[in-house]
């Protein structure tokens, strides 16, 4: 009976998501639903292959959480969970033999050799690049705080096209010692079915542009391409989600908004006060968003139109497959049945911060460490040291790539693959 259940669980895991490629990790958390799930399986134990330490660590847009919430009475206020911690590490994507990341400190997009960590090319923008690039059909899609979306060639790094949504008003203004555009691209770029989607702007009173461009040309050429200006709707910041018919956009210090994918028109906002922040995950008919509400840390589970279904207290990361929900807090990993909501296993952990599911292995990042657990029973399989808080995990083409808050990117793989190397930029 146990073997039968394991077999069924693995089958559900394999078919729960349509993968762009079993080996690649072409966008943040693998896909435009931000599942953080890949069918790739890494053979354990892993060994450090290379470690890249940049000249400058990340320069976050919001280094610390707000001091307090004005909407909560002084008697009820608690320490705030950071709602805008989307750029505290150099999150990476990886396709084939290449690794890509953007730098908020150097205003650049980088391409590294996946086997050695050596730089293949670098592209300079005029503002911080805060989100992981998206890779699609041999092209790199990224946005910058200079107010421009860029499409680059994956092989050479040469510019194919650029697009500035607020071009008629696109001036640079001071922000924490840097010059940024009021129309900064703070959504990442999501590419699907020949269209590139992103937002421009983060001041509600100035309005925010929602954009859908031809991914090949960077132009508004067909009916499904558009540019919509939304005034006083919110400050959209975080990684965009796509369903077949809708766009879901984290609201930063508010709850997510959702839009019609065909027209870009606003369809509504999730229930206010529940699950605010830059984290969002789409799984079947559920959206998980947070990691905070007005009472403290929580990930909110909601229907596709924002109707609240459940709250997951203190959870700061989640992975949801066909049958199981994996929840991470700073002190615990939990696996829960989606159907019965019964806890399958718990594991204590110190300073947990990120997860990725590769086959039947759950990788977990924490302070100065990355670990691997059996996803079925929670048994610890492997761990290794990393420099700093492991905030980003990518599994691609035989490697585990770890991004930390120091700016380091570390590649783990089979010890016999390539000699270990330290790369200093």
Question: Which residues fall in each region the model found?
Answer:
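Aromatic (tryptophan-biased) beta-strands that constitute blades/sheets of beta-rich domains
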Residues: 23-93, 97-100, 108, 118-125, ...
């Amino acid at each position: 009976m146990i073997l039968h259940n394991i077999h069924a669980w693995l089958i559900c895991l394999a078919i729960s998501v349509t993968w762009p490629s079993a080996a690649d990790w072409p966008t943040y958390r693998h896909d435009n639903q931000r599942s953080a799930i890949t069918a790739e399986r890494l053979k354990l134990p892993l060994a450090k292959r290379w470690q890249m330490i940049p000249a400058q660590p990340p320069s976050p847009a919001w280094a610390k959480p707000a001091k307090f919430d004005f909407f909560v009475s002084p008697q009820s206020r608690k320490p705030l969970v950071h709602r805008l911690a989307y750029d505290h590490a150099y999150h990476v994507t990886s396709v084939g033999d290449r690794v890509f990341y953007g730098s908020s400190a150097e205003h650049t997009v980088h391409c590294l050799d996946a086997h050695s960590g050596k730089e293949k090319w670098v592209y300079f923008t005029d503002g911080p690049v805060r989100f992981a690039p998206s890779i699609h059909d041999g092209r790199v899609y990224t946005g910058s705080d200079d107010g421009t979306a860029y499409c680059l060639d994956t092989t050479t790094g040469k510019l194919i096209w650029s697009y500035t949504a607020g071009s008629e008003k696109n001036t640079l203004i001071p922000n924490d010692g840097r010059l940024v555009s009021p129309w900064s691209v703070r959504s990442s770029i999501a590419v699907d079915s020949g269209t590139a989607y992103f937002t421009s702007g983060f001041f509600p009173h100035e309005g925010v542009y929602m954009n859908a461009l031809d991914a090949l040309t960077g132009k508004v050429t067909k009916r499904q391409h558009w540019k919509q200006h939304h005034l006083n709707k919110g400050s959209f910041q975080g990684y965009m989600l796509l369903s077949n018919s809708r766009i879901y956009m984290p609201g930063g210090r508010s709850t997510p908004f959702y839009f019609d994918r065909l027209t870009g028109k606003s369809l509504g906002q999730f229930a206010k006060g529940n699950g605010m922040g830059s984290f969002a995950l789409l799984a079947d008919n559920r959206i998980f968003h947070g990691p905070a509400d007005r009472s403290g840390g929580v990930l909110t589970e909601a229907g596709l139109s924002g109707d609240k279904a459940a709250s997951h207290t203190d959870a700061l990361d989640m992975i949801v497959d066909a049958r199981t929900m994996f929840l991470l807090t700073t002190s615990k990993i939990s696996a829960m049945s989606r159907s019965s909501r019964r806890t399958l296993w718990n594991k204590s952990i110190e300073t947990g911060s990120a997860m990725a599911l590769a086959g039947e292995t759950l990788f977990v990042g924490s302070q100065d460490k990355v670990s691997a657990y059996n996803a079925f029973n929670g048994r610890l399989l492997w761990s290794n040291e990393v420099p700093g808080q492991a905030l980003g995990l990518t599994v691609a083409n035989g490697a585990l790539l770890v991004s930390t808050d120091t700016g380091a990117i570390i590649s783990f793989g089979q010890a016999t693959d390539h000699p270990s190397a330290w790369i200093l930029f």
